[in-house]
């Protein structure tokens, strides 16, 4: 019907479209009551329509007796086609001209068909006035109403004839197509068919309850009522329910018949109805009430903004189910995607793989791609992991999003292609053995069409930004934190989780419930639901808030207690799963960030540190009457590039000029406190310069050496040439002679990079230059590692991560030749991007 309009019980006010004349429309009745309710007044044409309907059954009886069943079916099929074309083409043309030019109204006005004096001179006017008077109550004065209303009342008679004939001839054709053996009708198909028919009846009744006669008979093509478009009842669960789910009865009857010819006729009739909707009704609705197109939605605006701000951005390649959109001739990934499909098809037709092999390949591919994409989105939602990965390697935020678009689209295309090839192989096997069930194949193709339609509607509603989960990657582009309720999302919260697998189950139907296809369909459905519940919904709550969007279908179903109970049960299960997942994720987070932030080491290292501190006294007793202390160490933390000085003292009887002090990571030394079993790797210092005359680096660290009659003492300073540039818990060990025998062990202490909160790029640059200069690793304002072999590119990367909270890969540092200006600018840009994402 033309519009979804609901009015309150107050007096209705209407106005003509062009002249603006206001009036109160009279009470009218629906088609069934007008024709068949004996208590309601009947017009001449209504009596003729009723007799015509009854004549169809008489004609059917004689056709069967005279010409046989097959000829009777053919005649009623021809009749149905005629009346269906009269409906969609005939009424469509009339309404088209009425919508654009008000042709019927102008004709009536020009010929004065409803003027009182015309009835005496014009037999057409006389008949029309007689028809309206015989139809309406006695107090109805047609001359006091505008021509628009009277035209509409006559138009209703024309509609009643066509619609009732269309319905009657179709029902008779279906009846003639039923199997002669009644017992064959007792099966699950009949049960489903009856359920679909009952649902169809409810749709029609509820639709009329909402829209009343005015919209049922396309009243707004003639005049307008002071009422607004509404979405209530059946209009809450489906777009254009009279043309979509309002035809489920067609498919229910086809299912009961089990005749694919009936199904094809039903599909054809339904298809013509959609053409009527597309070319007649929808354009009129848009002109009259405004467009409901989501083209100006936030998601569409974001797509435009991305393209506007990034000159190298182009819309991603998308498979619509049949063709490709946005193919770019200069984008290699597009060629790679299309080539993959061509290779798969070529391999299928040349190698002819077995059904089992295709099943296993499809199953593994679906599982692998689902796990990969789900893991990426989960990590991206919690840590912005995917964006960080590309940012630290020198790429932009938009580039990382483009790579995700390719990865996601490629995984969809490959899995769907493999499923298609597997289904094709199954169909070929069935055709070779038992033969295909044509009805199953057609119903399966219809489900595939529903999935394609769902995908198109989803993309139309949320644009590329929503289709590719842009709110996981580009939250800084979101201007309005509000979920869309346009298009298909008015009716379903997650259409891809329900209708998005319709085609998958269509493959099950086409293959006559093949075990492999059932398994794949279950896999597709379960993975979709898990993804929506555990990844998508938590992220949506995080980005758009906890306010839930209630879809039309959900609103309708939640009014029923059983559905409400099931919904609560699923929500509880999902919340428990999310708590366990986030608990695991938090543990992994604590481990991943324990690499050296100020006071932010892992609990394992801190506990080790406290335990080791408690046994320092017992460690020093390894050498009695000795001293081994770190000087001026605040909070037991050394911030690089500061140096560390340790003072020592030993009895002269225990001293040897070959003694030396090594620096070790506590976690690597093990539990042996008397013998060091790992090498110092150059992080050591002599205590007496005479002991190692040729090791200048390891003797220049000696700042004091005193040798008395009873004791020997000294001070050693570990600077950037000897310290580790790996944050952690460390200790000094004093070794006897040129061995690894331990005489003294210092208190454990922490080596860490400093932390900075600099926002300006120039401040970041100054801090980096100051640090590199202090450790002799800068030349011409570039990182230069030759003067300090311990501060490698990895160490530089860790310094940037720990000091500024930004990750840069060593590959990027090398790629820009360690240029401090470029690196500082990159750090600044990444900080801005990540801050905007938060």
From Swiss-Prot:
Location, primary (coarse class): endoplasmic reticulum
The keyword Zinc-finger belongs to this UniProt entry's keyword annotation: no
Catalytic activity: a 1,2-diacyl-sn-glycero-3-phosphoethanolamine + S-adenosyl-L-methionine = a 1,2-diacyl-sn-glycero-3-phospho-N-methylethanolamine + S-adenosyl-L-homocysteine + H(+)
GO cellular component: endoplasmic reticulum membrane
Pathway: Phospholipid metabolism; phosphatidylcholine biosynthesis
Alphabetically ordered keywords of this record: Endoplasmic reticulum, Lipid biosynthesis, Lipid metabolism, Membrane, Methyltransferase, Phospholipid biosynthesis, Phospholipid metabolism, S-adenosyl-L-methionine, Transferase, Transmembrane, Transmembrane helix
Pfam families reported in the protein's UniProt record: PEMT (PF04191)
InterPro entries on file: Phopholipid_MeTrfase, Phosphatid-EA_MeTrfase_fun
GO molecular function, one term: phosphatidylethanolamine N-methyltransferase activity
GO biological process: methylation; phosphatidylcholine biosynthetic process
Topology in the lipid bilayer: Multi-pass membrane protein
Location(s) in or outside the cell: Endoplasmic reticulum membrane
Taxonomy, superkingdom: Eukaryota
UniProt keyword S-adenosyl-L-methionine, yes or no: yes
Broad class of enzyme this protein falls into: transferase
Ranges per topology, Cytoplasmic: 70-73, 179-184, 258-261, 350-356, 425-435, 539-838
Transmembrane stretches, start-end: 49-69, 74-94, 158-178, 185-205, 237-257, 262-282, 329-349, 357-377, 404-424, 436-456, 518-538
Function text: Catalyzes the first step of the methylation pathway of phosphatidylcholine biosynthesis, the SAM-dependent methylation of phosphatidylethanolamine (PE) to phosphatidylmonomethylethanolamine (PMME).
Protein family membership: Belongs to the class VI-like SAM-binding methyltransferase superfamily. CHO2 family.
HAMAP family recorded: PEMT (MF_03217)
The protein's name: Phosphatidylethanolamine N-methyltransferase 1
Species the sequence originates in: Vanderwaltozyma polyspora (strain ATCC 22028 / DSM 70294 / BCRC 21397 / CBS 2163 / NBRC 10782 / NRRL Y-8283 / UCD 57-17) (Kluyveromyces polysporus)
Gene from which this protein is expressed: CHO2-1
């Amino acid at each position: 019907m033309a519009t979804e309009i609901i009015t309150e019980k107050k007096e209705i006010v209407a106005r003509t479209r062009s002249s603006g004349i206001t009036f109160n429309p009279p009470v009218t009745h629906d088609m069934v009551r007008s024709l068949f309710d004996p208590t309601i007044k009947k017009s001449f044409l209504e009596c003729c329509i009723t007799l015509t309907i009854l004549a169809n059954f008489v004609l059917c009886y004689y056709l069967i007796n005279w010409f046989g069943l097959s000829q009777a079916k053919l005649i009623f099929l021809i009749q149905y086609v005629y009346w269906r074309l009269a409906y969609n083409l005939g009424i469509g043309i009339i309404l088209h001209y009425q919508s654009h030019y008000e042709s019927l109204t102008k004709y009536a006005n020009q010929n004065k068909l409803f003027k009182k004096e015309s009835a005496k001179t014009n037999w057409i006017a006389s008949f029309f006035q007689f028809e309206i008077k015989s139809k309406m109550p006695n107090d109805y004065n047609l001359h006091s109403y505008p021509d628009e209303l009277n035209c509409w009342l006559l138009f209703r008679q024309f509609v009643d004839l066509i619609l009732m004939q269309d319905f009657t001839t179709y029902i008779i054709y279906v009846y003639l197509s039923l199997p002669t053996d009644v017992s064959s009708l007792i099966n699950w198909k009949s049960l489903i068919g009856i359920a679909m028919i009952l649902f169809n009846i409810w749709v029609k009744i509820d639709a009329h309850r909402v829209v009343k006669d005015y919209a049922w008979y396309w009243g707004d093509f003639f005049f307008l009522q002071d009422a607004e478009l509404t979405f209530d009842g059946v209009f809450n669960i489906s777009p254009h329910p009279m043309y979509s789910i309002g035809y489920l009865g067609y498919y229910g009857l086809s299912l009961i018949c089990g005749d694919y010819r009936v199904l094809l006729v039903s599909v054809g009739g339904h298809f013509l109805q959609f053409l009527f909707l597309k070319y007649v009704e929808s354009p009129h609705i848009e002109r009259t009430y405004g467009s409901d197109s989501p083209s100006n939605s936030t998601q569409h605006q974001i797509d435009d903004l991305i393209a506007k701000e990034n000159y190298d951005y182009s819309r991603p390649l998308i498979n619509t189910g049949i063709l490709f959109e946005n193919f770019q001739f200069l984008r290699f990934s597009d060629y790679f995607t299309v080539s993959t499909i061509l290779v798969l098809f070529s391999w299928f037709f040349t190698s002819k793989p077995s059904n089992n092999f295709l099943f296993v390949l499809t199953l593994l591919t679906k599982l692998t791609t689902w796990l990969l994409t789900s893991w990426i989105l989960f990590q991206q939602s919690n840590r912005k992991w995917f964006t960080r990965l590309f940012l630290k390697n020198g790429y932009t935020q938009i580039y990382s999003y483009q790579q995700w678009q390719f990865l996601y689209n490629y995984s969809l295309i490959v899995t769907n292609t493999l499923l298609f090839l597997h289904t094709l192989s199954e169909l070929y096997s069935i055709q070779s053995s038992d033969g295909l069930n044509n009805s199953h194949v057609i119903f399966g193709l219809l489900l595939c069409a529903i999935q394609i339609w769902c995908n198109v509607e989803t993309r139309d509603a949320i644009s590329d930004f929503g289709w590719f989960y842009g709110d996981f990657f580009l939250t800084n582009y979101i201007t309005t934190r509000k979920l869309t309720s346009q298009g298909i999302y008015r009716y379903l919260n997650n259409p891809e989780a329900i209708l998005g697998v319709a085609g998958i189950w269509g493959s099950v139907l086409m293959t006559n419930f093949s075990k492999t296809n059932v398994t794949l369909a279950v896999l597709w459905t379960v993975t979709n639901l898990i993804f929506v519940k555990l990844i998508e919904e938590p992220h949506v709550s995080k980005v758009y808030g906890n306010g839930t969007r209630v879809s039309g279908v959900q609103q309708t179903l939640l009014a029923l207690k059983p559905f409400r109970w099931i919904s609560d049960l699923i929500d509880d299960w999902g919340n428990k799963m999310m708590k366990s997942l986030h608990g695991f994720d938090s543990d992994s987070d604590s481990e991943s960030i324990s690499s050296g932030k100020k006071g932010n080491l892992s609990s394992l290292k801190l506990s080790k540190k406290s335990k080791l501190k408690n046994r320092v006294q017992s460690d020093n007793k390894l050498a009695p009457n000795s001293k081994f202390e770190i000087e001026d160490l605040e909070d037991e933390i050394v911030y690089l590039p500061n140096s560390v000085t340790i003072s020592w003292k030993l009895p002269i009887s225990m001293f040897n000029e070959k003694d030396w002090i090594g620096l070790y990571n506590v976690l690597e030394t093990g539990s042996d406190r008397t013998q060091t079993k790992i090498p110092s790797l150059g992080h050591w210092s002599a205590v007496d310069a005479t002991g190692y005359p040729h090791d200048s680096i390891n003797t220049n660290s000696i700042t004091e050496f005193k040798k008395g009659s009873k004791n020997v003492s000294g001070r050693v300073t570990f600077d950037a040439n000897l310290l580790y540039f790996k944050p952690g818990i460390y200790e000094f060990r004093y070794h006897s002679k040129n061995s690894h025998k331990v005489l003294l062990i210092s208190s454990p202490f922490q080596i860490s990079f400093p932390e900075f909160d600099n926002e300006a790029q120039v401040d970041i640059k100054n801090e980096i230059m100051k640090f590199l200069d202090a450790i002799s690793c800068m030349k011409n304002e570039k990182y230069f590692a030759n003067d300090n072999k311990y501060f490698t590119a990895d160490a530089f990367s860790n310094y940037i991560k720990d000091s500024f909270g930004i990750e840069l890969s060593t590959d990027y540092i090398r790629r820009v030749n360690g240029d401090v200006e470029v690196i500082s600018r990159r750090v600044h840009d990444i900080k801005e991007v990540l801050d905007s994402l938060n």
